[in-house]
Amino acid sequence: MAFKLSKRSLKRLEGVHPQLVDTVKIALSKYAIYDFGVTCGVRDMATQKKLMASGASKTLRSKHLIQDDGYSHAVDLVCYDGGVRWEMPYYISTAEAMRSAAREVGLSLTWGACWHVKDYCAADDDCDDLMDDYIALRRSQNRSAFLDGPHWQARF
């Protein structure tokens, strides 16, 4: 089934790097098993500071902020299946769609559920295996894993 971004999601992609926008659109229309939308593209510093203070973000150097090229390099997605879904299997499925689309566009991505893999698109491992590897790595460092399955950021 081919899905299409809503007007609200398209509005949230304004100011996001065109290659990342293309990747999101292709992922949804060509590869996605589940419908998804965009919850965040460009973010201002005031919002970023609030998210960091609440623990929802780990940095003030977010790729959601406008970068030197004038674009945001990050998006957050939300999956739908009879309503909003936050369970990780939905985001693992979306991760496969995003990887396929990014390869088609020629974009390097980092996924928020496997931060240790800087070029997620170059990895051939299953998405859930990459996520498990990230969790194991963080445990071996006596640190907690920051799993942000909805988050995607481009690497330029």
Task: Indicate where each model-derived feature is located.
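Extended, low-complexity, intrinsically disordered C-terminal regulatory tails
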Residues: 25-56
